[in-house]
Each structure stands twice: as C-alpha cells, then as structure tokens.
Amino acid sequence: MSCGGSARKRRWWLITWSKHHGSFRKIPVPNPVQYSYTWIGLGTSEGVSAIAEPELPATFTFAEAEGRGLSRRRLQRLQDVGAVERIGRGLYRRTDEEPADHDLIEIAAKAHQPTLCLLSALARHELTDVIPPVHDVAIPRGAWQPAVSAPVQWHKFAPATFDVGRTGIRLDDTYAIGLYDAPRTIVDTFRLRHAVGPDIANEALRRWLRHGGKPADLMRLTKIFPAAKPALLHTLQVLL
C-alpha cells in the first residue's frame, strides 16, 4: 500500500486521531515492516494512504514502546503531534484513550501495592468536604518508595495488617490502585489523627454513622488497631 502511483517513491505514513487537537496527525514512517501496526486503507486525493495505529497499551513505559519497535525519536515525534502525552517520569499515554487520572496511574505504575488512605480515601467515600492537597497513599513498610511527579504523601503501613479493608479502583485497562474501605479509613484517621486532624476524623465518623454505618464494625477493627480505640470510643459516646 503506497501513496501515489507506481512511478513515485514508495512512502508510508503513521496517521493517528488526536482528541486533544481534534484532527488527524500524519507522521512519515521510513520502514513500516519493522513496526507492529494495524493498517487501514484510506482514499485521498493523492491515492491511497495508510493509517497506522501502534499496538501500544493505553498507558505504557518507554521500555514497552521500545519493545514494540518505537525509538525514542519516534516516540518524541508522537508526542509532538499530540498522539501520545507524557504523564509521568518515563510514563506515556495515548491521547485517543478515555480520560483518566494521570497522577494515580503514575503512582499505580511505579509503587508496590499503592493504596489510597486517610484524607484521599475519606474524599473517595464522600466522608469529607476537604479537597486533599496531595494524594495520601499507603505502601507496605519496607517497600521501595518511588520517585513520581504526582503530588503524593507516602505512608508506611505494617505489612501484617496492610490488606485489612483493602479494596481497589480500576484506573484504565492496564492499571488499578488500592483503596481502603470506609471503616478501615475511619479507624486509620483516629489512630493517625495527628496527621489528619481530630476535626476531620470526627466529621468523617459523624457522616459515616449518618449513612448507616455500624459502630460494631469499627470496634472490631480496633482489636487489630488498638491505638485508635480510646479516641474513637470517646467520640462514639459523644455522638451517640
């Protein structure tokens, strides 16, 4: 499949749709044989062109792109025309994918068992009106703390109890991130109220009870996290 008649030099183009720019972007491809593309014929005034879509996941690293035949120079060209955007250190995302939280994807891609906790988890459960200035993310104590461009406050939680109340959020087709459920989050805000603040912890508990939360669920968790029990029990007695 070539552009123009048989007398012309054979040329190939990588053409992708950019949602950001609202138009097709065309990039010359010197040797398409070395790349893995899905090719679709498109009639134009110059003959038949080729639309090539690189077989890359929605979010990928440079190493993954390189493994599929894209050089650093070509990856930069894809960024220049708006087909790909850099969303973190060494992390890229195709612009023709659905919108996603780039910060959380970067954290999920680089950290071991990252889990939204404390204020970030309260916000997810609609137990606070405070907008978290950074992402509160728990990782197991002893795990490597990665360097990321996203604003994040890392919290080291004990490995033995790390999975208690841990659920997850799907971010895209490739990545998911952990999230502590509401009872675990409330207990954490009371045992770590020096980091969150007593007013935020008390309001979160008040809202949770208002929406049908059962105090017994929290008291069971205090057997695992005894540091939360005194302040939590006192606040429950005041509210109830």
Q: What do these predicted ranges mean?
A:
Residues R8-R11, R25:
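Basic polycationic patches enriched in arginine
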